[in-house]
Amino acid sequence: MKDDSAVVPDGVLRVFADKSEIKADGVEEVTFRVMFGSQDVTAETTCTLIRTFEGNQNYMAGGVNKFSTTAPGTYTFKARYYYAGALYSDNEVEVVATPYFTGEEENYLQRVLGVYFTSTGCTSCPTASKGIANLQQAYPGMISIVSFHDDMVVDDPMKIEETAVFKAAFGGFQGLPRLFWNMRNGTDIIGPVFTDSYLEELGQYTPSCGVAVSAAYDENTRKLDIELGIKSNIPASYRYLLFLVEDDVDGYEQAGVNGSYLHQNVIRDVLVKSASGEKINNGLPLPVGSEVKASKSVVLDQSWNADNMRVVVAAMLSSDGGFTFVADNVNECAVGSSVSYLYAE
């Protein structure tokens, strides 16, 4: 990238890009520089790139200056920088992402991951949970929900260590309930109606991959052997998240509800300890159209009801040089069963 600092007047914020065109293959990147006068502020956490695509505006993480995509089209970028107040760039840069096609492209079904935070001490959570269930009924087979429990007023007996890890990944927000789509920051919503936010998330992207899951279970040993597969239309590097969830969990009181209450989508374990996911294929780009597999094993706790449990796997991609990862597609199966790749009709 050439040195543009000399052309930026003092007190002016301006953004530059090293490319005006990239392939929409999830691999090729454009790199930005943000100048405040003669000062390069690109890497500062108070400097944010604002991306606009098809009318939708998204704020990239502070200090991030790389962008790739799997969705062809025209993107515009401007910069915001906090310096005794919010400053915005006096220009925008345009990046065109051209279609990437190898002749082997599959039309994978677009399923969305919903990461939900709730608590037995939250009086508003039952209404939000009902709203999520209504959304799943309206769009059957299209949404996988995983629910982290957290303490609120009282200690929640279904809280796990990973609750704090994933909560931190979303900026350590305050207040419940919260639902995030596809591990994407800024998508959180309290509900209880989630339809608009779900449809907006669908419009953000077209999935580039499919996910298959097998969950073989030994009732005697309670050992669960999980095998997952990812097939991709693009030569991108993927990660994956793997959740064990249980439905119809009873025996715990719920604030805001009189009498018994069944908890759904309760995360019992996360077999990948980073909220960014675990690398697959040793972190190397996936061969287009070829399946790459990974496996995990776990012994189920005696208190968990295997008959009510599911395995949820999300394939993760980064569009900002590996700083953040979001779910590109998700699939799930019951413990003791399997599910193959799903295709749109």
Question: Model segments located where?
Answer:
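Beta-strand-rich structural segments
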Residues: 16-18, 26-39
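Local sequence-structure signature of Cys/Sec-based thiol-disulfide redox active-site neighborhoods
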Residues: 103-148
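Exposed beta-strand face motif in extracellular beta-rich ectodomains
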Residues: 28, 73-77, 307-311
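Short, conserved sequence motifs used for protein processing/export or organelle targeting and
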Residues: 147-345
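Bacterial Sec-dependent N-terminal signal peptides
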Residues: 1-22, 85-93, 97, 105-109, ...
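Short tyrosine-centred short linear motifs in exposed loops/low-complexity segments
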Residues: 25, 69-79, 236
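Short, solvent-exposed loop/turn segments at the edges of extracellular beta-sandwich modules
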Residues: 82-87, 319-321
